[in-house]
Amino acid sequence: LKSGAEEEIDLILKFGNVILIGEAKSIVTTDSSISYYRTYSTLKGATDQARRKALFFSSNIEEIFETFGWTYDPSISYQLFPVVLNSNKIHSGFPINGVPVVDEQVLARYFSSSTFSLISVKRDDKFHHLGWFK
C-alpha cells in the first residue's frame, strides 16, 4: 500500500458489502494419524492468519479499496469474514476457532445455493441428505 503497510492476503472476494478474506493452504495428503494431526494444526494456524489478514484489511480498508479501484462508501457497514481455503477435503465445511474451512467445492456451492450437503446416505438409488453446511 502507499502508506507502507503490507500483508500477504491470498484471497479477497467482494460481494456488495460482504468481503471474504482468505488464507489458502495447500495440503498434500492425510494418510495417517500423524498427517491428520499436522493437517489440523496447519489449518488451526491458518485461522489465526485469516483473522489477522481480516483485521489488516479492516484497518486499511479505504486504501485497499483505492488500490483495487473500488469505491469506498463510509456510510456502508462492510462485513469482513475470514475464511481458510483448503486444497484438501479434510475438515472442509467445518469451522476451526470460529473460522470456516472450505475447499473449492464448498466455496463454489455456497455461491450457487448457500447450502452444501455434508452427510448423505443412498437408499433406493436416491441420496438422502442428513447434514448441511449453510
Go through each PLM region and give its residues.
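Intrinsically disordered, low-complexity Ser/Thr/Pro/Gly-rich regulatory segments
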Residues: 1-134
